[in-house]
C-alpha cells in the first residue's frame, strides 16, 4: 500500500525532511508504491535538514510483486486512457482488464518521448496495477509522428536501438506491455500503402521476442484501422503471429461527404449508403486475411460525430452532408448537449439493420452518430458469438460523468 513520507519533523517544524528513492517508479519520493513482477528491495533515504546542515538516514523496503488474473477469451476489456483526460480512476474503469495509457511518442534518436505522461499521471495510472488491472504503454505514430516510427523500424540496427529503449521503459515504469499505434506504415510513401509492411512485421516480431524474453506475461498489442482500406498497409497474417491482440479501430468509419454511422455493427446492404463500413465487415476482412478470431478486439467509441445533412428525411441518414465535414464530440457532451433535449428539438433514431443509434437536432440541423447502451449490448453479443477476444474502448475520459457507457460495457461483458 502507499504510505506517507513526512516533509517536516512531527515535533519540530523547523526540521525539514527530504526523501529520495533508489527506484522512484517502485516507491516514489512521496510514498506511492508501484509493485513489479518480482520482489524488489528499494532504498529510501531521508535527508534531515536543520539550520543549513543535513544528516542522512537510509532504510531498505521490500516491495512484494503484483499478480494478475489470466485474461479470459471473450471477456477481456481494454480501455485506452489519454493523458490529457486522466485524473483518477472511477470504480467502473477499474473493472477493465487492461488500461492502455496513451501516449508516448518516438524521438528522432529512437528513444521514447514521455512528455505527455508526467509523474503525476504515471503514478496515478499505474496505481490500477494494485487492483489487478494491467497497464500497457501505448506508443503513437500518427501523421507527422509517423516519420520517427518509420525510421525506427527501417533497419535491423535501428530496430535494435528502438526495442532496447522500449523494453527499458517497460521495466523502469512497471508497465505490463506495449501497444503500438503506428498510423500508418507507408504514410510517407503515397501510392505504396504496403511499402513498410515488412518493416512493421520485423518490428513486432523482434519486439515481441524481446518483451517475452524479459517476462512471458508482457503483452504486445497493436491498434490497426478498420474499414476497407487501412488494413492494406499491413501484412495481417504475418504480424498477427507476433501480437497478443489486435485492436480493431472500428470507428471513424463514415465518409465525409455522406451522412453515415461512424461505428455501425453491420452495413445496410439494401441501402448501401447508410454506412461506409462496419464492425462486421472489418472483422470479416481481418479473419479472411489470416488473423485468428481469438486475437481480434473490436472497438467501442466513447465519442460521436455530427454533421449537417442536406435533407432531414429519416434524420438525414444516408443522404449527403451539406459541408462534407464531421465534428467530433465526446459522449459526455452528447449527453449534455443533445440527449438532454430529446423531444425538445432532438429526435432519437435506432437503425435496427446497422444496430446503431443516431440523433437529429432540428434546432441546429445536425445529424449525430454515436454509441449508446443498446449498441454496446449488440457489439458485445456479436463479439461473443464470433469467438473474438474482447472489446476495447477509445477513450475512457470521454464518457459522461456518471459513467453511462463504461457501466454498459461492464454489464454486458459479465
Each language-model region and where it sits:
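Conserved, mostly hydrophobic/aromatic
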Residues: 99, 137, 180, 207, ...
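Glycan-recognition patch characteristic of GH18 chitinases/ENGases
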Residues: 66-170, 406-408
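Extracellular/luminal low-complexity segments enriched in Ser/Thr/Pro
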Residues: 27-39, 43
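Solvent-exposed, low-complexity, repeat-rich "mucin-like" stalks and linkers
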Residues: 1-18
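Glycan-binding loop/region signatures in secreted carbohydrate-active enzymes
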Residues: 139, 300-382, 409-414
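Substrate-binding surface in catalytic domains of secreted glycosidases
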Residues: 108-120, 164, 185-336
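C-terminal edge beta-strand
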Residues: 55-68
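Append "Rare intracellular matches occur via the same short Y/T/C beta-strand/loop motifs
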Residues: 40-52
